[in-house]
Amino acid sequence: MNNLLSMEHLSNEDIYELIQTACDYKSGKQTLPQFEGKFVSNLFFENSTRTKCSFEVAEQKLGLKEVNFETSTSSVQKGESLYDTCKTLESIGVDLLVIRHSQNAYYEELENLNIPIANAGDGSGQHPTQSLLDIMTIYEEYGSFEGLNILICGDIKNSRVARSNFISLISLGANVMFSSPDEWVDDSLDAPYVQIDDVIDQVDIVMLLRVQHERHGITGEANFEANDYHEQYGLTMDRYNKLKDKAIVMHPAPVNRGVEIDSELVEAPKARIFKQMTNGMYLRMSVINKLLSGKEA
């Protein structure tokens, strides 16, 4: 596997291999590989806590040395292009790039590079490692995906998580439904839109999405009322109590408590939000291993 850019580039076999390796790292069944003498640079052009820190911990556990990159102090501020920035890092011997960027499909500009790239999120396009860690979390709970009913609630149109998960979960055999305000519907994704209260007692997984304030613009924000959104699309205690006994609640985070989910439900028994974060570190180790080992996915 030369790069991890989009879930569309992964077969089901690739997905299972990556999550199984991550599960083996987590259980201790498989020894962590060490990449002593290898260098990685994390280029985050958008804010991040979980993804950035998770990659950093994963890299350190695998023996990688980080070449620090800060957008605010780099030559990007002087007008240097993304390609030239990445080509510079390749030229000085960096072995892996982890990139988050506000531009959809930014990686199309980097096709001439000879260095592995892990996409840590491109605009509202894709977020493959988030999708993979979500899949890992579901796999740990259910052992398979065939026939699972999954409800994804929220800002579908602007969510790279929704897009990545829809692509992968449908391919793996799950049934995916969306619930969203009309202005956040994404017609490019062929899934039914439902009212959350009509299906809340039937789903196996409720996947809540953060409201993407930074992508809405002035008009979108003017029309947003947190309380109204919570009442119509959020996971309230009443809705939580209607979930099936073995249903789980997921959220890619950061969580807007009291908007997407009642604050007291973030760590409720059915919630797997912090487990997702733990799994993310192991999953990203699996991805790094695949990219640096040169094995075919």
UniProtKB/Swiss-Prot annotation:
Its EC number is 2.1.3.2. Carbamoyl phosphate binds at R50, T51, R100, H127, Q130, A253, P254. Pathway: Pyrimidine metabolism; UMP biosynthesis via de novo pathway; (S)-dihydroorotate from bicarbonate: step 2/3. It catalyses: carbamoyl phosphate + L-aspartate = N-carbamoyl-L-aspartate + phosphate + H(+). GO terms for cellular component: cytosol. L-aspartate binds at K78, R160, R210. GO terms for molecular function: amino acid binding; aspartate carbamoyltransferase activity. InterPro entries: Asp/Orn_carbamoyltranf_P-bd, Asp/Orn_carbamoylTrfase, Asp/Orn_carbamoylTrfase_sf, Asp_carbamoyltransf, Asp_carbamoyltransf_Asp/Orn-bd. Pfam families: OTCace, OTCace_N. Keywords: Pyrimidine biosynthesis, Transferase. Belongs to the aspartate/ornithine carbamoyltransferase superfamily. ATCase family. NCBIfam families: asp_carb_tr, PRK00856.1. Catalyzes the condensation of carbamoyl phosphate and aspartate to form carbamoyl aspartate and inorganic phosphate, the committed step in the de novo pyrimidine nucleotide biosynthesis pathway. This is Aspartate carbamoyltransferase catalytic subunit. It comes from Staphylococcus haemolyticus (strain JCSC1435). The lineage of its organism: Bacteria, Bacillati, Bacillota, Bacilli, Bacillales. The gene is pyrB.
